[in-house]
Amino acid sequence: MRKILLFFICMSCIKPNKTENNIHTDTKELEKYINLPVAIQKAEYEISKTKLGELSQDCSQIIEIHAVIKFSNQDYKAIFKSANKKYNFPLIVKKEDCRDWYPPYVKKYFVKESNELFKINSVVYEENNFLKENTKGNLIFFPVENNTICCIASICEK
């Protein structure tokens, strides 16, 4: 009886990693929010929705997207040609400084120096080729290795 009780106590102490269970690979859901000029070949992403209080005037909920998106070499280049604003500056993120809320599959790309950070302006300020039409939000693309882009988006939904 003690062994069974000890087993259940131990099992209740182990927390499942929710991040790993929520990773999607079907690009159709991702394409509901992000409008890229080229086809996505492969993607791993999470979409989380946070309801806001009744006093919120602009949004009823915030949609957070963390995605790692793979493209062909030609499509990868086309994305950056079509970006309306590019901000290039050194970006150094060490493992110990990495934001805790980034999922592991995104976090692994932020362990070395990167020379480029591409931030795409949101629709609120000027036209944005990468969010769906009439969408308020902010989108950041980090180019990483092998024609892959990390995308972090916050979208306001009414």
Task: Give each language-model segment a name.
Residues N73, A153-K158:
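Secondary-structure transition/turn motif
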Residues G137-N146, C151-A153:
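Short, exposed beta-strand-loop hairpins at the edges of beta-sheets
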